[in-house]
């Protein structure tokens, strides 16, 4: 037997064809969300308050300090928040201390800081009753970046950018003449030496002493206007810089000093963040820069004088291991520079300097300047960083140092929920800080309390804005559990502070070698967002700095055996090592079998001897994301189709009777477990009670845990979310075990579709162009039936003319239409409703004119009933019919929170049971998608020799050109699994190979080619050729024809052009565009064309008359002028063109009955006459219509 048995949970055993043993379990798949939010609560919030506080007033009399904070119990549970359209949030209370420095008095107080949204266990937020996900953002990391460009003359110019987390950018660049310039915050260029002078090194000699003899530097000094003077020229340089930054303002050295200090060295204005400091130190420290350089001086121990490395030594890994402890010391090769008193910063600057030989001219000595030992706590840039980065930049021309690749994942980092929230909170707090300062100067210092100073509105507003309208706060995709899980693991390069679709080029979107094990190379949307939205790879984790790490098995450096020790490496760290693939064959002791091993180093695939290998992949599926890892035989599919397969699995509709795939990958259990839709046991124990709505587990300590199951709830996508127990009374359950399946799950595994019998054959051309032929059995047996729940709501508001009323008594509505309404006018649960039926009867007061004496008398006698009301009932929209599943009524009397002006709100849930039908979209897991073209009676479908009819016929033409051969392999293995009565797992890149496949096919007693003779269901004759028949997992996707089919009768029109609106949502018409007009012109179908462009579109008068003519059975009148023509005339007149319309007799035609031309100002008499004519006309029409009451009613209604 090929393969071995593996248990997935307690309810499923699969035969697995994996050969590689799993040394590491998959991490919790939503950890990226939950860990980040937990960090925010534990540390992020406190960091924010510590940053902003203490707040001092302008005179220094008062000081407001932060003491601590606590989150109290949430007002609603998760379920209550959903029902009440509220937020799942907890009140945040902050303890503040106000110190009065004049009197020494200290006041402490608890201040309420608003309700703070909490994350649910599933990694989501409930905002206004809807579940939302905060997507992690992929951004450029703060740090120092070096880049080069080659111009058309093949000259290489270099550039440097210092990117902070927030603050001004600092850029260096060389021009075509090799002169070095600096730009501050994208302004005009300044010679590099001017910035050095401004930092307090005013004379040329100071600069040359520090940086050494560099060609570019010398050329820059030549260009510098303050050259050839021995005395310091700091002030002049400062004035020059100020003039460039603030042109037109009076320049003084003092204002320039304070400006530069504020731009770069003020921690409140400039922030590198801890990750920026880490990256800057890593890039500029001599530890990384000395590697592979040749020393131009002998290095000795400062204490003993013992030589560590001789002059002329090349610094390789071994030499660096000896040097490293010394480079970490403060007293090793450290030079202290004292800037002049006129400089921006006057503190001594410590730099580490070592001489090495140039790579370009080997005997030339070059100063390598490191930024000294700057602690992790220094979050802003310091002069040492500026000087060391300049040195790195100048040394690039000598061949020292390396160019950065900005698409390398060592230079891109993840901002998860916690950090995004923290940034938003900072915005709110800094706005609040301004208010506090102002209030401190206004309030009486003797009596003021912290509560009086604080205004929490900006803080609350910024958090609300973030959750409500940020590009990264998204309505959760709840089509199925895989869609949920993927949404929580999504990485977006878009959003505030990220890229925009239009500016993103190919490089950013492309797959980079550092994506390996960190980001999925396959799962990304098709279309404008391709490559900008990615998915976290299955084993990847995010480190505290926000860089993605992936696990590797360590290879022992002395025995060269692969150990089970796991190291998580960032992309930067991985660049230093050689990594073998997970499928490299190993002996039992962990040594490599082969004499050469296929391995990776940076972007090279190399064959190398095993003793050079440092690490080995943990698992073959560490390359791909969760959805991609659910595709069996992924290695046999073309990447474009695999992309579609991964994306379409997220769109599968949860079915009424889900079945897990016969051919799985072993990923189904983990995906379902971590998705958050299943019910997991919180504690171990024994099941005491089970029914459809509740499971009770007796814990080992004697306490009882009760789990309430979700029954027929509407998901965000309008699908049915339902949970069903999979345990029975007496079962023992472990912690974290699945005790109830969620939607699209079976026995704790993901079950997105079904396992039908599929044949690759044509059937009467019905499966031309990816169409699908279905057997009626799939309809009859509810194989692909799904439940959809739609929510409708109606509000009764206060209007200017009185309150709206929910009632049964609706004007002009017969008893038949009210049969399902209760005494209050709300539809009953269980009623079957069709399009246009009333769900909530509601009337709104009409505008009442001044009443006459008689009417007032009637009012007094009969009360309110005589008042005019109009029908504003909630009705079932087109295609929305079904069965009323639930009705919820919210009123102020019952204590529900309603919006202002709303007295009552009714919510109605309608359930539809949708069977598969012609027009529905279906797909397999290999990107093999299609739409149903015909449903054939079971008896007419082709059948197998044993009489079993085939369920689905797919076109064989869908395979060769698309190169997704995985579907054919799945088909054969699926048939073998069905015949053997087993489920199989074939993990990605480590699944069944052709030997395993044919061995299993043989074991199942199938033909050696995997094909079968098929018989025509209509004639009973065998088909000419043998056909590939088998079991393939096939899903119904959420693009159903019921949601798309649409027809318009008379509907809304656009206000200006008077043409029908477009789209199903607006009950719009079909667009008849330019090319369609050409088609009718080519046919010579003049009358058809005329009526399309007039009656059916924007001939306002004509369409009313046409309607009347149709109702009365009269001939259709001649068409009039389309409204859009009049719009065109008016637009041309608005441009100042005197546009007139002439008839055949060259006389001007008036486009309106009355034109408001200046020559033709209409008199009051003329208006009165016109009104009288109109009244008369109406009276005539009314008389004519009275003859036929029925038609009059219908005309009125439509009008």
From Swiss-Prot:
It catalyses: RNA(n) + a ribonucleoside 5'-triphosphate = RNA(n+1) + diphosphate. Residues 1188-1199 have a biased composition (Polar residues). InterPro entries: DNA-dir_RNA_pol_bsu_ext_1_sf, DNA-dir_RNA_pol_bsu_external_1, DNA-dir_RNA_pol_su2, DNA-dir_RNAP_su2_dom, DNA-dir_RNAP_su2_hyb_sf, RNA_pol_bsu_bac, RNA_pol_bsu_CS, RNA_pol_bsu_protrusion. PROSITE patterns: RNA_POL_BETA. Keywords: DNA-directed RNA polymerase, Nucleotidyltransferase, Transcription, Transferase. It is an enzyme of class 2 (transferase). Disulfide bonds: none annotated. The keyword NAD does not apply. It comes from the Bacteria. CDD domains: RNA_pol_B_RPB2. Residues 1175-1199 are annotated as: Disordered. Belongs to the RNA polymerase beta chain family. This is DNA-directed RNA polymerase subunit beta.
């Amino acid at each position: 037997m090929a393969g071995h048995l593996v248990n997935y949970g307690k309810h499923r055993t699969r035969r697995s064809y994996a050969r590689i043993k799993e040394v590491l379990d998959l991490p919790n798949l939503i950890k990226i969300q939950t860990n980040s939010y937990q960090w925010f609560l534990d540390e992020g919030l406190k960091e924010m308050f510590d940053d902003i506080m203490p707040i001092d007033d302008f005179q220094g009399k008062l000081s407001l300090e932060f003491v601590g904070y606590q989150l109290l119990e949430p007002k609603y549970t998760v379920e209550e928040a959903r029902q009440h359209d509220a937020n799942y949030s907890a009140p945040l209370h902050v303890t503040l201390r106000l110190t009065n420095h004049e009197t020494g008095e200290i006041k402490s107080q608890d201040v309420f800081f608003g309700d703070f949204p909490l994350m649910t266990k599933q990694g989501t937020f409930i905002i206004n009753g809807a579940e939302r996900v905060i997507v992690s953002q992929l951004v450029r990391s703060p740090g120092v970046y070096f880049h080069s460009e080659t111009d058309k003359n093949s000259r290489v110019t270099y550039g440097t950018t210092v990117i902070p987390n927030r603050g001004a950018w600092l850029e260096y660049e060389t021009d075509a003449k090799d002169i070095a310039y600096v730009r501050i915050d994208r302004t005009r260029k300044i010679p590099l030496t001017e910035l050095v002078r401004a930092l307090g090194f005013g004379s040329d000699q100071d600069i040359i002493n520090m940086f050494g003899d560099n060609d570019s530097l010398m050329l820059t000094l030549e260009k510098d206007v303050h050259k050839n003077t021995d005395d310091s020229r700091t002030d002049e340089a400062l004035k020059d810089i100020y003039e460039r930054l603030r042109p037109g303002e009076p320049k003084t050295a003092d204002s320039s000093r304070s400006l530069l200090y504020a731009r770069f060295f003020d921690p409140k204005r400039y922030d590198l963040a801890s990750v920026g400091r880490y990256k800057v130190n890593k890039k500029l420290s001599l530890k990384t820069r000395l590697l592979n350089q040749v020393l131009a001086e002998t290095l000795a121990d400062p204490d003993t004088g013992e030589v560590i490395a001789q002059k002329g030594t090349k610094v390789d890994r071994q030499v660096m291991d000896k040097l490293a402890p010394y480079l970490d010391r403060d007293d090793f090769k450290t030079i202290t520079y004292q800037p002049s008193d006129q400089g921006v910063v006057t503190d001594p600057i410590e730099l580490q300097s070592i001489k090495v030989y140039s790579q370009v001219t080997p005997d030339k000595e070059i100063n390598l300047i490191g930024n000294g030992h700057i602690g992790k706590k220094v979050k802003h840039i310091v002069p040492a960083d500026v000087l060391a980065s300049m040195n790195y930049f100048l040394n690039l021309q000598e061949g020292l140092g390396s160019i950065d690749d900005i698409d390398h994942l060592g230079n891109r980092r993840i901002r998860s929920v916690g950090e995004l929230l923290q940034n938003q909170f900072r915005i709110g707090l800094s706005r609040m800080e301004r208010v506090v300062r102002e209030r401190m100067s206004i309030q009486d210092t003797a009596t003021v309390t912290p509560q009086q100073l604080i205004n929490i509105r900006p803080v609350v507003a910024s958090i609300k804005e973030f959750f409500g309208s940020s590009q990264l706060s998204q309505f959760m995709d709840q089509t199925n559990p895989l869609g949920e899980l993927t949404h929580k693991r999504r990485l977006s390069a878009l959003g505030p502070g990220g890229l925009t679709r239009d500016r993103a080029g190919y490089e950013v979107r492309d797959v980079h070698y550092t994506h390996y094990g960190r980001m999925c190379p396959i799962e990304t949307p098709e279309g404008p967002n391709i490559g900008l939205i990615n998915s976290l790879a299955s084993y990847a984790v995010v480190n505290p700095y926000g860089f993605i790490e992936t696990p590797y098995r360590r290879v022992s450096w002395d025995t060269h055996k692969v150990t089970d020790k796991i190291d998580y490496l960032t992309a930067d760290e991985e660049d230093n090592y050689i990594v073998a693939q997970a499928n490299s064959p190993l002996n039992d002791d962990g040594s490599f079998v082969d004499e050469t091993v296929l391995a990776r180093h940076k972007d090279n695939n190399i064959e190398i001897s095993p003793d050079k290998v440092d690490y080995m992949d943990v698992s073959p599926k560490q390359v791909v994301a969760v959805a991609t890892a659910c595709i069996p035989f992924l290695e046999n599919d073309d990447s474009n189709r695999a992309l579609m397969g991964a994306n379409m699995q997220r769109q599968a509709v949860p079915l009424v009777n889900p079945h897990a795939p016969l051919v799985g990958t072993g990923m189904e259990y983990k995906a379902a477990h971590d998705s958050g839709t299943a019910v997991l046991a919180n504690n171990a124990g024994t099941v005491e009670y089970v029914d459809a709505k509740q499971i009770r587990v007796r814990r080992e300590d004697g306490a009882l845990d009760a789990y309430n199951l979700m029954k027929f709830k509407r998901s965000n996508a309008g699908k049915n979310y339902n949970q069903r127990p999979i345990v029975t009374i007496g079962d023992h359950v472990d912690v974290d075990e699945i005790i109830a399946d969620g939607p699209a799950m079976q026995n704790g595994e993901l079950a997105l579709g079904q396992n039908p019998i599929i044949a690759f054959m044509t059937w009467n051309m019905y499966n031309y162009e990816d169409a699908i032929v279905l057997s009626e059995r799939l309809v009859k047996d509810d194989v692909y039936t799904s439940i959809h729940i739609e929510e409708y709501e109606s509000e009764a508001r206060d209007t200017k003319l009185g309150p709206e009323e929910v009632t049964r008594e609706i004007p002009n509505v017969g008893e038949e239409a009210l049969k399902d309404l209760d005494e209050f006018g709300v539809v009953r649960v269980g009623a079957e409703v069709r399009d246009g039926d009333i769900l909530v009867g509601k009337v709104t007061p009409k505008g009442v004119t001044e009443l006459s004496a008689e009417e007032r008398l009637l009012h007094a006698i009969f009360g309110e009933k005589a008042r005019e009301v109009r029908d504003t009932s909630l009705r079932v929209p087109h295609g929305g019919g079904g069965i009323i599943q639930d009705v919820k009524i919210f009123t102020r009397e019952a204590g529900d929170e309603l919006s202002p002006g709303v007295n009552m709100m009714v919510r109605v849930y309608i359930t539809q049971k949708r069977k598969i039908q012609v027009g529905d979209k279906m797909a397999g897991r290999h990107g093999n998608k299609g739409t149903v073209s015909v449903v054939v009676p079971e008896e007419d479908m082709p059948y197998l020799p044993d009489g079993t009819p085939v369920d689905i016929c797919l076109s064989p033409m869908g395979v060769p050109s698309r190169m997704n051969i995985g579907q054919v392999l799945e088909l054969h293995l699926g048939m073998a699994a069905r015949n053997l009565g087993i489920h199989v797992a074939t993990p990605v890149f480590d699944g069944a190979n052709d030997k395993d496949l044919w061995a299993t096919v043989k074991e199942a007693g199938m033909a050696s080619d995997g094909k079968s003779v098929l018989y025509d269901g209509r004639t009973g004759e065998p088909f000419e050729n043998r056909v590939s028949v088998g079991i393939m997992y096939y899903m119904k996707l959420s693009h159903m024809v019921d949601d798309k089919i649409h027809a318009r009768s008379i509907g809304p029109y656009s206000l200006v052009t008077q043409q029908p609106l477009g789209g199903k949502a607006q009950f719009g018409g079909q667009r008849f565009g330019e090319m369609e007009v050409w088609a009718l012109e080519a046919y010579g179908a003049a009358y058809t064309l005329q009526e399309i462009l007039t009656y059916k579109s924007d001939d306002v008068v004509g369409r009313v008359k046409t309607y009347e003519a149709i109702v009365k059975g009269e001939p259709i009148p001649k068409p009039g002028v389309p409204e859009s023509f009049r719009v065109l005339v008016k637009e041309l007149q608005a441009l100042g063109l005197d546009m007139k319309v002439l008839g055949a007799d060259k006389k001007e035609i008036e486009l309106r009955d009355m034109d408001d031309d200046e020559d033709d100002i209409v008199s009051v008499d003329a208006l009165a006459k016109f009104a009288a004519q109109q009244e008369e006309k109406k009276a005539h029409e009314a008389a004519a219509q009275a003859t036929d009451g029925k038609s009059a009613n219908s005309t009125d209604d439509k009008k």
